Curated annotation (Swiss-Prot):
This is Biotin synthase. Coiled coil: none annotated. Pathway: Cofactor biosynthesis; biotin biosynthesis; biotin from 7,8-diaminononanoate: step 2/2. It catalyses: (4R,5S)-dethiobiotin + (sulfur carrier)-SH + 2 reduced [2Fe-2S]-[ferredoxin] + 2 S-adenosyl-L-methionine = (sulfur carrier)-H + biotin + 2 5'-deoxyadenosine + 2 L-methionine + 2 oxidized [2Fe-2S]-[ferredoxin]. Its EC number is 2.8.1.6. The keyword Methyltransferase does not apply. Its cofactor is [4Fe-4S] cluster; [2Fe-2S] cluster. Belongs to the radical SAM superfamily. Biotin synthase family.
Length: 345
């Protein structure tokens, strides 16, 4: 195996500065060395506890500090979550992600969270959670329940971070990633484009991720979804080519990681999404309401997959069950996303 590159902001900036077509060619070349370029990993994300978050993340409609019209909801019952997971599997998802608007989970919540993980795993799906800061014991308990992935985004560069969030330090985020990794859970961590950051900040974010002791297995790259009532509601739109560049640089810097198109995909036309796949994106959230922002409808995703000749990735599970992939490919069912919260409605 080749020696791992220790990335600097300068090196990452050099990639961002490349002519776009050269950058895309390099990213696609790297992508093909590590992945089947036609395969796309498909996940569904459910908000299991919505709103009333004490954090002050300026982009987030779930913060209790902003008036966005979002109605807070308590932690969902375990069976409600499992029913949503069944629908997600039937409609093609191979990974089920559960998100809660907390600074950190409380002890009283842990037994329910463990039951959710165990129940989804029993269906033969991969599991992911995003619950805020974890301590070592909580990470171990989730690992023992069978949690495959834990999402905890760094959001932006260390230098720009304080302009966006003041209630949780950058180091706290890094510490949580370390505890998750130490418990044997795979790491999902990325950031957001469009917060008002510079290209150097985007480079700095990717450097932080790529230089972790083990890079994240999954790197979600979000485009800011501007929600009325949040401090960033009037931010300038992200140039699609700038977003595509970020995807490409992420692919080159973290060649073995899944690079996921996450929030903001509903704002992208088919051509932008196609160029993101060309740049090395190989994971999406499909057929869901992405926490408190909308996501494209399932049939649009399927149509785009067909146009581009892409296939949803088969995931080998403990039951060897790839029935969900077949259902997605054949579009046998129409999704029912009533359980997935959408603050845009």
């Amino acid at each position: 195996m080749a020696d791992r590159i220790h990335w600097t902001v300068g090196l990452a900036q050099t990639l961002f500065d490349k002519p776009l077509l050269e950058l895309l060619f390099e990213a696609q070349t790297v992508h093909r060395q590590h992945f089947d370029p036609r395969q796309v990993q498909v996940s569904t994300l459910l908000s299991i506890k919505t709103g009333a978050c004490p954090e002050d993340c300026k982009y987030c409609p779930q913060s209790s500090r902003y008036k966005t019209g979002l109605e807070s909801e308590r932690l969902m019952q375990v069976e409600q979550v499992l029913e949503s997971a069944r629908k997600a599997k039937a409609n093609g998802s191979t990974r089920f992600c559960m998100g809660a608007a907390w600074k950190n989970p409380h002890e009283r919540d842990m037994p329910y969270l463990q039951q959710m993980v165990q129940g989804v795993k029993a269906m033969g799906m991969e599991t992911c959670m995003t619950l805020g800061t974890l301590d070592g014991t909580q990470a171990e308990r989730l690992a023992d329940a069978g949690l495959d992935y834990y999402n905890h985004n760094l959001d932006t560069s260390p230098e720009f971070y304080g302009n966006i969030i003041t209630t949780r330090s950058y180091q706290e985020r890094l510490d949580t990633l370390g505890k998750v990794r130490g418990a044997g859970i795979k790491v999902c961590s990325g950031g957001i484009v469009g917060l008002g950051e510079t290209v150097r900040d985007r480079a700095g974010l990717l450097v932080q991720l790529a230089n972790l002791p083990t890079p994240p297995e999954s790197v979600p790259i979000n485009m800011l979804v501007k929600v009325k009532g949040t401090p960033l509601a009037d931010n300038e739109d992200v140039d699609p080519f700038d977003f595509i560049r970020t995807i490409a640089v992420a692919r080159i810097m973290m060649p073995a990681s899944y690079v996921r198109l996450s929030a903001g995909r509903e704002q992208m036309n088919e051509q932008t999404q196609a160029m993101c796949f060309m740049a090395g994106a190989n994971s999406i959230f499909y057929g869901c309401k992405l926490l408190t922002t909308p996501n494209p409808e399932e049939d649009k995703d399927l149509q785009l997959f067909r146009k581009l000749g892409l296939n949803p990735q088969q995931t080998e599970t403990e039951h060897g069950d790839n029935q969900q992939q077949q259902a997605l490919a054949a579009q046998l069912m129409q999704a029912d996303t009533a359980e997935f919260y959408n603050a845009a409605l």
